[in-house]
Amino acid sequence: MKPYLELLQHVLEHGAEKSDRTGTGTRSVFGWQMRFDLNDGFPLVTTKKLHLRSIIHELLWFLKGDTNIGYLSDNQVRIWDEWADDNGDLGPVYGKQWRRWTGPDGVEIDQMQWLVDEIKRNPDSRRLVISAWNVGELPQMALMPCHSLFQFYVVNGKLSCQLYQRSGDIFLGVPFNIASYALLTHMVAQATGLGVGDFVHTLGDAHLYSNHFEQAREQLTRTPRALPTLRLNPEVTDLFGFRFEDIAIEGYAPHPAIKAPVAV
């Protein structure tokens, strides 16, 4: 995970001091790109332990089109709790936009189903794009999309994905985002009969919160370990048919977790 650690160090050393929506304060750079060859191992940060259950269940929750934290709570995932209302609702966030984008005529569009069909139908298309940034519904969202747009690319029988993330919490959020979209790429590839290529992660405002500086420095003292391997149940060929039990991360032996507060 050298690209991630290089970002962490660069922002610590060269980032600009900025205020932010949460009032915490950040150190930030604008415009950064990382590339991960998914054939070299699953890109999961090893210099601190990540909560795999949260990463997997959150992605399955997105793919269900769900926007209520009930499913997450039932599976001991708490990463969205701070933003939910008293009924557990978050408004029309990622799952709604991925599976039920509402057009100007009121018709709902299943972007993810369209994507799978289009990859099979026209793998050379330059329009294999999914957006969560639905301007008309942004005010209703508990949190506007940070990872807002992603595109797939097929060449030589391999599927690659590029994510544009407008805002990236480097210490807490970005490691989750890398793993989540790498997992999604593997799942879409299996559902479309393709191998995997690269995951490219492009960040707009890449920032470290001021109350994460010491944790970031601690992480940079640790030596990265071998990347784990992702195993998907080969019998699942429907993107929306994956369950938690169909996804396994093998050989993950990270350094201990490093606690840090979430900026809300």
From Swiss-Prot:
Q: Identify the Gene3D superfamilies for this entry.
A: Thymidylate synthase/dCMP hydroxymethylase domain
Catalytic reactions on record? dUMP + (6R)-5,10-methylene-5,6,7,8-tetrahydrofolate = 7,8-dihydrofolate + dTMP
Q: Which organism is it from?
A: Xanthomonas euvesicatoria pv. vesicatoria (strain 85-10)
Q: What is the lineage of its organism?
A: Bacteria, Pseudomonadati, Pseudomonadota, Gammaproteobacteria, Lysobacterales
Pathway in which the depicted protein is active? Pyrimidine metabolism; dTTP biosynthesis
- Name-wise, this protein is Thymidylate synthase
* Gene it is expressed from: thyA
| Subunit details | Homodimer.
Which positions are annotated as binding dUMP?
R21, R126, R127, R166, S167, G168, D169, N177, H207, L208, Y209
Instruction: For this UniProt record, give its keywords in alphabetical order, as a comma-separated list.
Output: Cytoplasm, Methyltransferase, Nucleotide biosynthesis, Transferase
Which HAMAP family would you find in this protein's record? Thymidy_synth_bact (MF_00008)
Q: Could you name the Gene Ontology cellular component terms for this entry?
A: cytosol
